[in-house]
Every structure is written in structure tokens, then in C-alpha cells.
């Protein structure tokens, strides 16, 4: 064992980690048929691969050839949306206003520049810069984590263990999508021919559990609406898994985030019909109009334009809790209004409110502060998020997974 440590573990690793603990996390992971030494080799190789990957700041993956004209269109839409001053419930909340200003400077500078080539270069590597993630700093969190040998070993082992558990707990069709693909150049753990990422697991899990909750395989001509869709990995997964089903996925988000979602969806689903604000701004947002598209991307305030009962299911994950309380109450009211009878609301959010001193003392409103006892609705699910998969970190942070069903 000592010889193996000396030969395989870099000097910095030996100097900074308690080796007994470091090696302990190897056992029980990797392939069940692997020998102990093979397991160790797999985990160590994965750690070193991620470290090398984190040092790469460029991306060899070329964007689709028509990206620049498409981004020029997105620039025009963004400029028009920013010139519109929404009513107070739809202005950026205190947490996001401060986070965008503080942690997404490079992305916002590219978005404000009007230079399509500059924005293209940012978006082609959006997983490796401040465009997305945990308030724009997910890649920095990952870099800091992999400076600590023991924490990085735990992270890698945890992802591999979750990967192996996934098909036993979730719908196995979604397992392939724990790999987020090539666009945006994600950084992940290489295993079983895939690149495993925490966000990939999260979105694959959401897609699986949402599909179960609404019995997706038995539905046709659905309109699904997500409030705060991020870079649109969840709709990508749902569209590719349920490719035999005809449905429309509507994303409502801040104007700053919609270009990322549009780029990602166009790159991954080039043949899909994507409806954007410039062609839907003035006309009605009736169900029949929405059904002309595979994806529809609209600014958050357009939720008021959706007719009563026009949506079959609404999704919100790790988003509403980041908003001010009056904004949350407004959105919950809108969700009740737009959801059709027999429809669903699927949400995963923090259960308890949390203050952020680094963001000027702004505070999240936890789900315990929301009123989800809606007349005519019943709870189909109310459990700690990741309970079945033992996603310990999120359980400790107090995230809950709730499904509400509106009576027919």
C-alpha cells in the first residue's frame, strides 16, 4: 500500500490529505466487479482528469455554423426587452440583482456589447466561465473543491455511486443524460464512457421524477411551462427522451438568461421549432399558438399573457426561493391561474429561508413560508429532495421536492 501511494499520489496530495480517509472513499464505488486496485486506479484517474479539465479555459467544440446570425437576432430581442420596464413583481429580485452585478460581469459585458462574435465565444464555453451555475460561480466552486484532495475524492466517488444507483431508483431512460453533452464544454467526471456532472444528475433526476409525477408517457399535446429555466438542460432532456410525444415547452426567465437557453437549445436540438419574443410579442399567447413550437422562450413578465388554464404543468427548481417574498407570492398566484384542471406544479426549492451576507444581506424565502394549501389542489409528493438517491449535501441544505395536482 505504501508503495502504491508513493507511486500514484502526487506529492501535494500526500502532504495535504489524511491518506486513510482519502483511500476509504474508494471502496464501494466504481464497478462492483472491479478489484480493489482497479477501483483505486479508476477514482484517481478521474480526479486527475478533472483537474486537467479545469485548467482548460478554451473549448474545441465549434458552435453551429449559423450561430452568429442567430445571436444577432437575440441581441435585438434583448435590447428591446431591457428597454421595457416591467411592473414591480417582475423586476429582478434583490438576490439576483446583486448576484448578476457581482458575479456575472464577463457574460453581461458580452451580452451588452452587441458583438455577436464576442458573445459566441463566451457561450461556447459557458460551463467554464461566469455565465451560469450557482449564481454564476459554479466553475469557481469546482476549482476550489479540487484543490482539496479529500473533498475532490469524495466528490468523484459520490458522483460515480449516484450514477450506479440512478437506474435502480429513477427511470433508466434518463441515465444517458447525466452527461450534458458537448455544447458549453462542461467539466465532469469521466466514467463508463460518460462525463458525469452534478448539474447533469440534477436535471436528469428532475426530468425522471417530473415525468413520473405527471405520467408523461400517457400524455399528448402537452404545454409545459418552466419558471426560471436557466440554460435549458431540463427541457433538452425531456424533449430527447420523450421524442415520440408532441408537446411544447415554455421557458419564462430573466432577459439576461434567455440568450443562453436559446443558444443551448438551438445547438442541441437544431431541427426544433423555437419561438422567440420578436415573433410572439404582440400576438396572443393562446394554447393553439404555443403548440406551433417545440420550445418557446419568453421574458418572465409574459406569464401574465398566458390565458387561464392554458398550461398542463409548471416546473420551478431552485429558483423561486431566490426571489423576494412579494415576487414569490405573485408567481404562485400566476401558477394557480395558468394551470389547467388536471394539471401539475412540480417544484424543488429550499425549505428554509437563508440570508446571504456576501450579497448585501439579501434573504431567500424558504418553502416553509409559502402557502401551498391551494383550494382544489392536492399534494401528490412532499419529501426531502434527493431522499431516494441520498444526495446528502442538498438534504442538509433543506431542499424539498413537492408535486401539487389540480383537480379535474
Whereabouts are the PLM-identified features?
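Membrane-proximal basic amphipathic "stem/tether" segments
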Residues: 1-85
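Conserved Class I S-adenosyl-L-methionine-dependent methyltransferase catalytic core
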Residues: 86-219
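Conserved class I S-adenosyl-L-methionine
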Residues: 219-230
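Conserved SAM-binding loop of SAM-dependent methyltransferases across substrates and taxa
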Residues: 231-244
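S-adenosyl-L-methionine
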Residues: 264-307
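A short SAM/SAH-binding and catalytic strip from SAM-dependent methyltransferases
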Residues: 312-326
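A short glycine-rich, Lys/Arg-flanked "PGG" loop and its adjoining helix->strand segment in the class I
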Residues: 329-341
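Conserved beta-strand signature within the Rossmann-like core of class I S-adenosyl-L-methionine
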Residues: 341-353
Amino acid at each position: 500500500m505504501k508503495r502504491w501511494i508513493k507511486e500514484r499520489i502526487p506529492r501535494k496530495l500526500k502532504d495535504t490529505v489524511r491518506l486513510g480517509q482519502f483511500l476509504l472513499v474508494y471502496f464501494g464505488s466504481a464497478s462492483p466487479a472491479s478489484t480493489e486496485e482497479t477501483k483505486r486506479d479508476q477514482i484517481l484517474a478521474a480526479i486527475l482528469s478533472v483537474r486537467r479539465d479545469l485548467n482548460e479555459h478554451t473549448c474545441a467544440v465549434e458552435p453551429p455554423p449559423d450561430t452568429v446570425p442567430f445571436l444577432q437576432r437575440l441581441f435585438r430581442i434583448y435590447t428591446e426587452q431591457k428597454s421595457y420596464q416591467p411592473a414591480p413583481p417582475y423586476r429582478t429580485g434583490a438576490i439576483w440583482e446583486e448576484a448578476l452585478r457581482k458575479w456575472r460581469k464577463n457574460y453581461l459585458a458580452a451580452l451588452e456589447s452587441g458583438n455577436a462574435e464576442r458573445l459566441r465565444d463566451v457561450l461556447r464555453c459557458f460551463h467554464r466561465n461566469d455565465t451560469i451555475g450557482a449564481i454564476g460561480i459554479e466553475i469557481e466552486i469546482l476549482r476550489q473543491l479540487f484543490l482539496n484532495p479529500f473533498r475532490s475524492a469524495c466528490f468523484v466517488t459520490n458522483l460515480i455511486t449516484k450514477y450506479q444507483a440512478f437506474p435502480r431508483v429513477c427511470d433508466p431512460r434518463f441515465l444517458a443524460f447525466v452527461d450534458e453533452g458537448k455544447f458549453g464544454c462542461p467539466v465532469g467526471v469521466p466514467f463508463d464512457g460518460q462525463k458525469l456532472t452534478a448539474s447533469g444528475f440534477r436535471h436528469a433526476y428532475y426530468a425522471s421524477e417530473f415525468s413520473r409525477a405527471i405520467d408523461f408517457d400517457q400524455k399528448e399535446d402537452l404545454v409545459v411551462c418552466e419558471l426560471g429555466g436557466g440554460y435549458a438542460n431540463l427541457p433538452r432532456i425531456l424533449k430527447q427522451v420523450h421524442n415520440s410525444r408532441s408537446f411544447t415547452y415554455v421557458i419564462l426567465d430573466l432577459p439576461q438568461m434567455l440568450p443562453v437557453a436559446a443558444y443551448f437549445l438551438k445547438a442541441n436540438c437544431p431541427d426544433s421549432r423555437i419561438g422567440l419574443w420578436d415573433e410572439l410579442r404582440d400576438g396572443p399567447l393562446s394554447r393553439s399558438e404555443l403548440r406551433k413550437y417545440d420550445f418557446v422562450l419568453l421574458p418572465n413578465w409574459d406569464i401574465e399573457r398566458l390565458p387561464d388554464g392554458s398550461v398542463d404543468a409548471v416546473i420551478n427548481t431552485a429558483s423561486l426561493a431566490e426571489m423576494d417574498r412579494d415576487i414569490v407570492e405573485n408567481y404562485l398566484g400566476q401558477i394557480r391561474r395558468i394551470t389547467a384542471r388536471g394539471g401539475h406544479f412540480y417544484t424543488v426549492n429550499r425549505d428554509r429561508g437563508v440570508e446571504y451576507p456576501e450579497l448585501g444581506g439579501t434573504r431567500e424565502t424558504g418553502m416553509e413560508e409559502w402557502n401551498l394549501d391551494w383550494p382544489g389542489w392536492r399534494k401528490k409528493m412532499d419529501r426531502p429532495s434527493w431522499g431516494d438517491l441520498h444526495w446528502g449535501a442538498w438534504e442538509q441544505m433543506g431542499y424539498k421536492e413537492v408535486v401539487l395536482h389540480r383537480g379535474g
